[in-house]
Curated annotation (Swiss-Prot):
It is a multi-pass membrane protein. Belongs to the cytochrome b family. This is Cytochrome b. Its cofactor is heme b. The cytochrome bc1 complex contains 11 subunits: 3 respiratory subunits (MT-CYB, CYC1 and UQCRFS1), 2 core proteins (UQCRC1 and UQCRC2) and 6 low-molecular weight proteins (UQCRH/QCR6, UQCRB/QCR7, UQCRQ/QCR8, UQCR10/QCR9, UQCR11/QCR10 and a cleavage product of UQCRFS1). This cytochrome bc1 complex then forms a dimer. One of its GO terms (molecular function) is ubiquinol-cytochrome-c reductase activity. InterPro entries: Cyt_b/b6_C, Cyt_b/b6_C_sf, Cyt_b/b6_N, Cytb/b6-like_sf, Cytochrome_b, Cytochrome_b_C_euk/bac, Cytochrome_b_N_euk/bac, Di-haem_cyt_TM. It comes from Damaliscus lunatus. One of its GO terms (biological process) is mitochondrial electron transport, ubiquinol to cytochrome c. SUPFAM superfamilies: a domain/subunit of cytochrome bc1 complex (Ubiquinol-cytochrome c reductase), Transmembrane di-heme cytochromes. The lineage of its organism: Eukaryota, Metazoa, Chordata, Craniata, Vertebrata. It comes from the Eukaryota.
């Protein structure tokens, strides 16, 4: 009998990607985050679709339409909070996924890595535009501050900002276009994720040792389907705990005040997952310099394959590089904390030191550590 999953044109693609895919036998739970990100994306698209059915992208009604969703729509509150906290879960998974890639040298797969960086940028843009939609105080002022950064671009800056705004300030036109973009972007992310997977399946997965696993492969199903199912269960458990017990834990109280262009909130800050980049932006006194540092803080990931000086791929057997990696993690946590603090002493200097440390670690200290480790056996 001919097996349909191996012959049918559509089933064949699914089979080769999720069923008969040869996978390394030793990939740990750090390899679960790819599938978890897929689940997050599907969840965000579904909850977002139902929210869009009741949301109105007009400055006069946006805030009240979100209130209406929470109060009057059947299970609207749970859909809204699953969407808001789903974004946080998405970014937790993203950061862990990227961190895994850095630790185990997954960036050696150039195409997969670069598409991943584009995915990160697209997700950040989508999340930013989504944060503007409820039209609360932090939505409005966050949009104003972040879009205004583009005015630092020489010569075309001001025109560019007004073009994005669709006027001379963040207003109705801005909200409408942000809603349109926020709706379309997740589908672009789906397409990019498929390209990401396509490139990954060209090379096969990396594994914790960083050594070729061609000699020891196992089928993806049932081994990793069951492992991913457990990961999904834990992800949904964590999300529902957040949604049902502390839905506003990661949000900003200011966003429960309708947007008012005449009243600036005391501390304008983005959602927690952007705070590290926001801290880097604020740590540089010059506006253009700050914007460049902000972009470079993410774009620097593209340089990772070029900065890889070690003879080994993974940091599994490289203790000095491991120390550097965990110092980088601590530094990013410090930046996240600083991004949420007011601009005053001692936070300013801590932010500046942490920002310098961030770039120093990636550009200088980590490649140096690798070079030292390469030469250690000679000593």
């Amino acid at each position: 009998m001919i097996n349909i999953r191996k012959t049918h044109p559509l089933m064949k693609i699914i089979n080769n990607a999720f069923i008969d895919l040869p996978a390394p036998s030793n990939i740990s739970s750090w390899w679960n985050f790819g599938s978890l990100l897929g689940i997050c994306l599907i969840l965000q698209i579904l909850t977002g679709l139902f929210l869009a059915m009741h949301y109105t992208s007009d400055t006069m009604t946006a805030f009240s339409s979100v209130t209406h969703i929470c109060r009057d729509v059947n299970y609207g509150w749970i859909i809204r909070y699953m969407h808001a906290n789903g974004a946080s879960m998405f970014f937790i998974c993203l950061f862990l996924h990227v961190g895994r890639g850095l630790y185990y040298g997954s960036y050696i797969f150039l195409e997969t890595w670069n598409v991943g960086v584009v995915l990160l940028f697209a997700t950040m843009a989508t999340a930013f535009m989504g944060y503007v939609l409820p039209w609360g105080q932090m939505s409005f002022w966050g949009a104003t501050v972040i879009t205004n950064l583009l005015s630092a671009i020489p010569y075309i800056g001001t025109n560019l900002v007004e073009w994005i705004w669709g006027g001379f300030s963040v207003d109705k036109a801005t909200l409408t276009r942000f809603f349109a973009f926020h709706f379309i972007f997740p589908f672009i992310i789906v397409a990019l994720a498929m390209v990401h997977l396509l490139f990954l399946h060209e090379t096969g997965s990396n594994n914790p040792t960083g050594i070729s696993s061609d000699a020891d492969k196992i089928p993806f199903h049932p081994y990793y389907t069951i492992k991913d199912a457990l990961g999904a269960l834990l992800l949904i458990l964590a999300l529902m705990l957040l949604v049902l017990f502390a839905p506003d834990l990661l949000g900003d109280p200011d966003n429960y005040t309708p947007a008012n262009p005449l009243n600036t909130p005391p501390h304008i800050k983005p959602e927690w997952y952007f705070l590290f980049a926001y801290a880097i932006l604020r740590s540089i006194p010059n506006e253009l310099g700050g914007v460049l540092a902000l972009v470079l803080s993410i774009l620097i990931l593209v340089l990772m394959p070029l900065l890889h000086t070690s003879k080994q791929r993974s940091t599994m057997f490289r203790p000095i590089s491991q120390c550097m990696f965990w110092i980088l993690v601590a530094d990013l946590l410090t930046l996240t904390w600083i991004g949420g603090q007011p601009v005053e002493h001692p936070y300013i200097i801590i932010g500046q030191l942490a920002s310098i440390m961030y770039f120093l670690l990636i550009l200088v200290l980590m490649p140096m550590a690798s070079t030292i480790e390469n030469n250690l056996p000679k000593w």
